[in-house]
Every structure is written in structure tokens, then in C-alpha cells.
Amino acid sequence: MSAEVALVYRVLPESVEVDVEKLKEAIVNRLAPKYKVDKVEVEEIGFGIKALRFYIRMPESDEYSSDEVEEILRSVEGVGGFELEYFSRLSF
């Protein structure tokens, strides 16, 4: 059985005017079906700014990479920035 990799990304919208629900939907749609989004949390930062935290799973394979996930995040309109908070190999 092959292992999987877990990633957690914190994504910031480019401005407070960005609808985080629409941004969340756009990111999930761009990642799917190749990457599995297990959960998305909305984090209140302050002054109306909200961050999104994406919990993503992918097979441990050369066909999948955190670089590709980051390219996808960069390509979504409304994303102001992001950071990889967690990266771990999962095996069962």
C-alpha cells in the first residue's frame, strides 16, 4: 500500500474585499480532482481580514508535488499569499 502526504496551507486573500467563501470554492475546484481537500478552516485575523487553512492529501508519487499545489494557488484570482504550515508523510 502506498503512503500519502499531508499538507496544510494557510492562504491569505489579496484584500478584505475578496469573498473568502468564493475564494475557498475556487481553490477547491482548481485542486480537484487530483488533490484531495479534507477540510478548510476560516481564521479571523482582525480588521475584517480572514485567512483560509487548507488540509490537503495526495499520494506519495512523482505525479504529485507541493510545487504543483503552489502553482495552482498562485493561479487563483484573489489569492494574495500563502504559506506551507505542515508537511508530513502518512502511512497506514
UniProtKB/Swiss-Prot annotation:
This is Elongation factor 1-beta. SMART domains: EF1_GNE. Promotes the exchange of GDP for GTP in EF-1-alpha/GDP, thus allowing the regeneration of EF-1-alpha/GTP that could then be used to form the ternary complex EF-1-alpha/GTP/AAtRNA. The gene is ef1b. Belongs to the EF-1-beta/EF-1-delta family. The keyword Zinc-finger does not apply. Keywords: Elongation factor, Protein biosynthesis. It comes from Pyrobaculum calidifontis (strain DSM 21063 / JCM 11548 / VA1). It comes from the Archaea. The keyword Protein biosynthesis applies. NCBIfam families: PRK00435.1. InterPro entries: eEF-1beta-like_sf, EF1B_bsu/dsu_GNE, Transl_elong_EF1B/ribsomal_bS6, Transl_elong_EF1B_B_arc. GO terms for molecular function: translation elongation factor activity. It holds the Pfam family EF1_GNE. CDD domains: EF1B.
